[in-house]
């Protein structure tokens, strides 16, 4: 009978086979000293206490105690793979970036797919946006495109990002997911309507990672060899076709195969069924941006394809699984501020906030020298700068080269060719409230023109099935927002909520303890 076991299930067997007739390695401590016995402690007699000099034990246990690093605040659960990006169409008229240098050029890439709100052990089949981050290892340094599987996002101002994420995670007292928190935030910020509608549509639960699109989401700026800038958006369209899971399928898989996304991707690559995506851009001139009826840097809106058609660029192919998950997926760090010449940020407020936040969280999670880790190292370029030392520096620390600038000793020099493009800014400095920007027009188009009748029906059912857990006043506020999009949208959700509420499915109030002073008295503690 043929062996039908999956490659992922046979990983240990395949690893052994890859070593052919090699002898097992000599077992050592972390310091490389041979170990004679890995099964038994060094004790005084068979029943005696452990000796402090049992360095084999202390070496093992001390390292075990420090195995875990901080989990990502968002996108904690993820799958990774490696491959290449190949240029199929010339866009050098728009960008001088070396990744687009000529047709046929291949650039090594690393990709990480992820859910957003769940912890590292959560299921891959939850209703949640999916991260779609790509690291291009180019000759001008790494380019990190930190996208999602949706072209829009919940908020347009980075000031709101921490509160948005808090609302999606666990209640600080009950440590449970809380529909009140989720829907209170969404209902108070109608700009979330577009992404919420996308999230609760059929595309809210992709069938693994291979059958979904990816988007840079933000607006970026491309600059050509003549230093002529143009705004752009990036798109990855899956060549496997869009495929989604039903709620019932997702619930079943969350119990039977919670790592379904990782599992599916690993097996496809291990069996030579390499997933691929076609890479496109949209472009908008500065003059068009000035005239367009909405803010082109608003992350809650798309650029309509009829106005700004997709321009094909190349192909992204994944053909290698990680050799080690921790080393190549857990430690990979994507940073939107990694942009080689030819690619620059736009005034997109969310992008501007991420330019700081992402490298900052990597320094917290992985350390100041995280870019020296092999998976993050810009190995196609030569790193030469004036950064030195720091925890876990494991390069040569740039040897005896000067560590100050300017200097007279032939150390790294400025590269005028890499100068950022010029742009004019003239406005008053203030905190501008964008909450009343048009939050419904594109959502109305999505509801009435993109979705079919059956898809609208499922959208409203999915929303009501989740919103029913929130307090009635929050439900009313959310329904008002849906009604602003289209009366039919609000009416359908309200009708379903009325049914749920009549059946007693509305939120039960959980009594919580409130600490009124800086100290808890003994009597208070006794009643906790």
Swiss-Prot record:
Catalytic activity annotation: 2 H2O2 = O2 + 2 H2O
Organism of provenance: Glandirana rugosa (Japanese wrinkled frog)
GO biological process: hydrogen peroxide catabolic process; response to hydrogen peroxide
Keyword match Iron: yes
A Gene Ontology term for the protein's cellular component: mitochondrion
Similarity remark: Belongs to the catalase family.
Residue interval(s) of motif Microbody targeting signal: 525-528
Residues holding heme: 358
Keyword Metal-binding: yes
Primary location: other
E.C. number(s) listed in UniProt: 1.11.1.6
Subcellular locations according to the entry: Peroxisome matrix
UniProt function note: Catalyzes the degradation of hydrogen peroxide (H(2)O(2)) generated by peroxisomal oxidases to water and oxygen, thereby protecting cells from the toxic effects of hydrogen peroxide.
InterPro entries per record: Catalase (IPR018028), Catalase_3 (IPR040333), Catalase_AS (IPR024708), Catalase_clade1/3 (IPR024711), Catalase_core (IPR011614), Catalase_haem_BS (IPR002226), Catalase_immune_responsive (IPR010582), Catalase_sf (IPR020835)
Gene name, Swiss-Prot/TrEMBL: cat
Record-given protein name: Catalase
Keywords: Heme, Hydrogen peroxide, Iron, Metal-binding, NADP, Oxidoreductase, Peroxidase, Peroxisome
Active site, UniProt feature: 75, 148
Oligomeric form and interacting partners: Homotetramer.
């Amino acid at each position: 009978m043929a062996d039908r076991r999956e490659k992922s299930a046979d990983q240990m067997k395949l690893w052994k086979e890859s070593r052919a007739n090699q002898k097992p390695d000599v077992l050592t401590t972390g310091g490389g000293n041979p170990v004679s016995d890995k099964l038994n402690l060094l004790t005084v007699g068979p029943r005696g206490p452990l000796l402090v000099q049992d360095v084999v034990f202390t070496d093992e246990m001390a390292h075990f105690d420090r195995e875990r690093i901080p989990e990502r605040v968002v996108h904690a659960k993820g799958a990774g793979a490696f491959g290449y990006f190949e240029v199929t169409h010339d866009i050098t008229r728009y960008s001088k970036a070396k990744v687009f240098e000529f047709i046929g050029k291949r650039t090594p890439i690393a990709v990480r797919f992820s859910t957003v709100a769940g912890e590292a052990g959560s299921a891959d089949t939850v209703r949640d946006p999916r991260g779609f981050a790509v690291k291009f290892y180019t000759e001008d340094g790494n380019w990190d495109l930190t996208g999602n599987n949706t072209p829009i996002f919940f908020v347009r101002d980075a000031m709101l990002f921490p509160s948005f994420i808090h609302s999606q995670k666990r209640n600080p007292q009950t440590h449970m997911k809380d529909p009140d928190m989720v829907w209170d935030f969404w209902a108070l910020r109608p700009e979330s309507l577009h992404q919420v509608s996308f999230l609760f549509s059929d595309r809210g639960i992709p069938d693994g990672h291979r059958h979904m699109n990816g988007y840079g989401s933000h607006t970026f700026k491309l600059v050509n060899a003549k230093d002529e800038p143009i705004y752009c958006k990036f798109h990855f369209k899956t060549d496997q076709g869009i495929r989604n899971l039903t709620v019932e399928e997702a619930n079943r898989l969350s119990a039977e195969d919670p790592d379904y996304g990782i599992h599916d991707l690993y097996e496809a690559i291990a069996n030579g069924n390499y997933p691929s995506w076609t890479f496109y851009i949209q472009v908008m001139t500065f003059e068009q941006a000035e005239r367009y009826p909405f803010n082109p840097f608003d992350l809650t809106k798309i650029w309509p394809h009829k106005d700004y058609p997709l321009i094909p660029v190349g192909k992204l192919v994944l053909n290698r699984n990680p050799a080690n998950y921790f080393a190549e997926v857990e430690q990979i760090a994507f940073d939107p501020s990694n942009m080689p010449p030819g690619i620059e940020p736009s005034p997109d407020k969310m992008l501007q906030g991420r330019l700081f936040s992402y490298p900052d969280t990597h320094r917290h999670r992985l350390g100041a020298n995280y870019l020296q880790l092999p998976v993050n190292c810009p190995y196609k370029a030569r790193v030469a700068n004036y950064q030195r030392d720091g925890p876990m520096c494991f390069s040569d620390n740039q040897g005896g080269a000067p560590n100050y600038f300017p200097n007279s000793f032939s150390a790294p020099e400025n590269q005028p060719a890499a100068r950022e493009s010029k742009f004019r800014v003239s406005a008053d400095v203030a905190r501008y409230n964008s909450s009343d920007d048009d939050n419904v027009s594109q959502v109305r188009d999505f509801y009435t023109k993109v979705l079919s009748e059956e898809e609208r029906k499922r959208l409203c059912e999915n929303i009501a099935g989740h919103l029913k857990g929130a307090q009635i006043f929050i439900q009313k506020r959310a329904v008002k927002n849906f009604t602003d999009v289209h009366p039919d949208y609000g009416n359908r959700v309200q009708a379903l909520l009325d049914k749920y509420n009549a059946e007693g499915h509305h939120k039960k109030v959980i009594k919580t303890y409130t600490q009124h002073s800086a100290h808890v008295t003994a009597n208070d503690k006794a009643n906790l």
